[in-house]
């Protein structure tokens, strides 16, 4: 039984799900907004919030933890340089999920996730 399991499964094995969330988080931080399914947007929201919280901390251990998650090293450096100025007064809630039209092929609910 999977009582109280908070991890969204997304229909994937654990290693593929982790790789998907890492790539979505990397692309979201790189581009500022991405369009994906609603379930994936809600799943990546917590991951990106955690990475931005690490960037606000700015310590060496937080930087190494972020480098272990984000695929692009230069992106981590850029995030850590600008996070305190951009998100300094905000305690969480760094992303916004906006629902859009359903996908044409399979009628899946789509959403735009963007950084605040």
Swiss-Prot record:
GO cellular component terms, A-Z: cytosolic large ribosomal subunit
Family that this chain belongs to: Belongs to the bacterial ribosomal protein bL17 family.
Ribosomal protein recorded as keyword: yes
Record bears the keyword Ribosomal protein: yes
Subunit structure as annotated in this protein's UniProt entry: Part of the 50S ribosomal subunit. Contacts protein L32.
InterPro entries referenced in this protein's UniProt entry, alphabetically: Ribosomal_bL17, Ribosomal_bL17_CS, Ribosomal_bL17_sf
Keywords, alphabetical: Ribonucleoprotein, Ribosomal protein
Gene name as annotated: rplQ
Protein name according to UniProt: Large ribosomal subunit protein bL17
Originating species: Microcystis aeruginosa (strain NIES-843 / IAM M-2473)
Pfam families, per database record: Ribosomal_L17
Disulfide bonds: none
Molecular-function GO term, any one: structural constituent of ribosome
Entries under PANTHER family matching the protein: LARGE RIBOSOMAL SUBUNIT PROTEIN BL17M (PTHR14413:SF16), RIBOSOMAL PROTEIN L17 (PTHR14413)
Gene Ontology annotations of biological process type: translation
HAMAP family, A to Z: Ribosomal_bL17
Gene3D superfamilies: Ribosomal protein L17
Regions that span the bilayer: none
């Amino acid at each position: 039984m999977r009582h109280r399991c908070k991890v969204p499964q997304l229909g994937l094995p654990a290693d593929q799900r982790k790789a998907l969330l890492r790539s979505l988080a990397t692309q979201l931080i790189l581009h500022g907004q991405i369009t994906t399914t609603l379930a994936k947007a809600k799943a990546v929201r917590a991951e990106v919030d955690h990475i931005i919280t690490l960037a606000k901390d700015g310590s060496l251990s937080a930087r190494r933890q972020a480098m272990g998650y984000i695929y692009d090293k230069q992106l981590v450096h850029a995030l850590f340089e600008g996070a305190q100025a951009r998100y300094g007064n905000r305690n969480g809630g760094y992303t916004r999920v906006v629902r859009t039209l359903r996908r044409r092929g399979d009628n899946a609910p789509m959403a735009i996730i963007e950084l605040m």
